[in-house]
Amino acid sequence: MGKKNTRNTKGRIIQAAWRLFYQQGYDDTTVEEIIAESGTSRGSFYHYFEGKDALLSTVSYLFD
């Protein structure tokens, strides 16, 4: 059950970031907005990503 939750949480963060980056642009999107959109916590965000730049690298790789 832990692995499924892990993938779910990370996936929700990535999907939320993609939506917000697309709608608002990378520079105008904050980590707080990504956290709110994904329904996760600040701790979860930083557990998976060092910051917004690291998240952008993942989003770019997955959606390229």
Where are these regions (language model features)?
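Short hydrophobic/aromatic patch on the recognition helix
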Residues: 39-49
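Basic, helix-initiating cap at the start of DNA-binding domains
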Residues: 1-24, 28-40, 54
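Residue-level detector of secondary-structure transition/capping positions
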Residues: 21, 63-64
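Nucleotide phosphate-binding site architecture
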Residues: 27, 46, 61
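Alpha-helical DNA-contacting segments of helix-turn-helix folds
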Residues: 49, 56-63
